[in-house]
């Protein structure tokens, strides 16, 4: 069960990593006509990493991996939903929301492999056997599936909204509005899958994890 939860959440994460990265530039080019702002977002991610690396382990030690992840995902969900429910005309306000939403996904990326390790140890704790190779293969397969779905979905999405590729092409108003929706709905779908995977399916909270490792150590 924990591995299934991690795999579902990872599907969502790969939608964000692959899908959002694939289409993010379109919204700044076609909707805001401010591709220069993308460099600001890239620079803003550096201090996020600098802050998260020392902070996340402390949060995990106090609250556990699942609780820390859930807080990060909920935070990312809030900032991701805002551009969907209300149209953000100001490129700087939009960029701030993107950066704030990225914080939760950064935490997810930092912790997800630790959850995979917990899944391997859970198998030994629950069933008295380890299947590291099989479980790692399943998890890696879920990442590949997520990337494939993201790439294919983005291609179909762009075609559906009437986007026409080309450096000198002027997009229709419908295509521009479609780009805005497509770019912003991907993080929302990501967060939903992560909430389901980590919040509803993954069943190793701090107390259970500590008990699991205590019993494994005693063997």
Residue spans for each PLM region:
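Membrane-embedded alpha-helical bundles of multi-pass transporters/translocases
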Residues: 1-218
């Amino acid at each position: 069960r924990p591995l299934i939860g991690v795999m579902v959440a990872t599907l969502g994460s790969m939608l964000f990593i692959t899908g959002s990265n694939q289409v993010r530039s379109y919204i700044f080019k076609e909707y805001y006509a401010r591709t220069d702002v993308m460099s600001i977002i890239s620079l803003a991610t550096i201090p996020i990493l600098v802050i998260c690396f020392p902070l996340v382990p402390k949060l995990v030690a106090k609250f556990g991996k699942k609780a820390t992840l859930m807080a990060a995902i909920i935070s990312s969900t809030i900032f991701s939903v805002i551009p969907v429910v209300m149209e953000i005309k100001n490129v700087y306000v939009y960029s701030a929301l993107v950066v704030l939403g990225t914080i939760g996904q950064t935490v997810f990326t930092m912790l997800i492999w630790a959850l995979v390790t917990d899944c391997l140890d859970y198998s030994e704790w629950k069933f008295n056997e380890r299947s590291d190779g099989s479980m790692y293969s399943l998890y890696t397969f879920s990442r590949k599936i997520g990337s494939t779905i993201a790439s294919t979905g983005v291609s179909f999405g762009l075609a559906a909204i009437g986007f026409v590729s080309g450096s000198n092409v002027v997009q229709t108003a419908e295509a521009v509005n479609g780009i805005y929706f497509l770019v912003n709905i991907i993080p929302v779908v990501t967060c939903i899958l992560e909430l389901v995977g980590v919040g509803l399916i993954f069943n190793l909270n701090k107390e259970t994890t500590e008990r699991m490792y205590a019993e494994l150590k005693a063997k």
